[in-house]
């Protein structure tokens, strides 16, 4: 029992800074929306449309680079720290190549925006302008993620948290300058949010690099000599590990976007209630998602040390802590769902629907916690392909079709509206949790030599 308590302390020491960093990141998006809304409703809508395109694109790159964390954690655990700097350099090359692709996609996203039915031309122009300003921050964001993954792979999560809050504090005044045109800058409205956020990502990256250069604990890593050129073999391995994670993230984001589109014809009340419940459940998701990142580090580190039993302990501890957290957040959601809904809107119909949907959200929080932590465990084992297959099957083969049938057809019951989609979420997330656990058990029952050989690739 003592080993689980000790492991839980180590996990939480890693997870809490990651949680706070994620809160800072979320707060930046909130600040952009509020400050753009203070300028005009059109600018706020433009930022919302632009963000809905930016997120899937940048999260794809983010997911690709998540491969670095278990690689660095295992090298650190095995005492092969001299190889870490080379992996990080290749991570920067990969981030640079992916940034170019993302920037090209975002530059041409105007075709998607203007294709939207009945969109106001002025709104479309502002959304395109916002994206074309924001896209210059894509390299800064992804370079920051490489540096952050280096620190977190070495079990140092606090730098990412500090840089997140630095970014938030810088974002507010820079937003103000570019939205309203102060200190000789042009008045750009919502487009100014894109300029500010792009600049902030570069500030965060440069601040993180400055920290890494000065950190005594990483002196041996930054002094490591080696080629700075792209090395196809290393980059290929990072892509093989990271691409399934990137695709899984992309599938998850697009799933919720598709459901939002399917709900939109049902009316204002249904759309508002769905959005409130989704926004709140996304906030709750920060907890297990951050814990999953910590579990990846701990499992990878233990495998690097050559201890499959300690890796199992880290995995089981992460699951136990995650289930405890999810139980508490579910109780909180059920107990205060109406009061939470009232914070968003005071329309009685909207509040009633949102409260009902949050009840369904509480049901799946434990499954959601298990599946996302399970994904983190599999990343630690470098078993990332299974994450993609499980995500695709659970969300797109089971969850979305069942939600569609329940929400919009009478094949099983009378059309349930948004609640049908949320039952689909429950089906999808529960299926994902079961499959993640089965895959984890399959891996852990392999002979230790095979587990370590797979993990060291």
Curated annotation (Swiss-Prot):
The chain crosses the membrane at residues 11-31, 53-73, 93-113, 127-147, 160-180, 189-209, 243-263, 276-296, 314-334, 350-370, 387-407, 418-438. Multidrug efflux pump that functions probably as a Na(+)/drug antiporter. One of its GO terms (cellular component) is plasma membrane. Pfam families: MatE (PF01554). This is Multidrug resistance protein MdtK. The gene is mdtK. Residues 32-52, 114-126, 181-188, 264-275, 335-349, 408-417 are periplasmic. Residues 1-10, 74-92, 148-159, 210-242, 297-313, 371-386, 439-457 are cytoplasmic. It is a multi-pass membrane protein. GO terms for biological process: sodium ion transport; xenobiotic transmembrane transport. One of its GO terms (molecular function) is xenobiotic transmembrane transporter activity. The lineage of its organism: Bacteria, Pseudomonadati, Pseudomonadota, Gammaproteobacteria, Enterobacterales. It comes from the Bacteria. InterPro entries: MATE_fam (IPR002528), MATE_MdtK (IPR050222), MdtK-like (IPR048279), Multidrug-R_MdtK (IPR022913). Belongs to the multi antimicrobial extrusion (MATE) (TC 2.A.66.1) family. MdtK subfamily. Disulfide bonds: none annotated. Keywords: Antiport, Cell inner membrane, Cell membrane, Ion transport, Membrane, Sodium, Sodium transport, Transmembrane, Transmembrane helix, Transport. HAMAP family: MdtK. Its main location: membrane. It is found in: Cell inner membrane. It comes from Shigella flexneri serotype 5b (strain 8401).
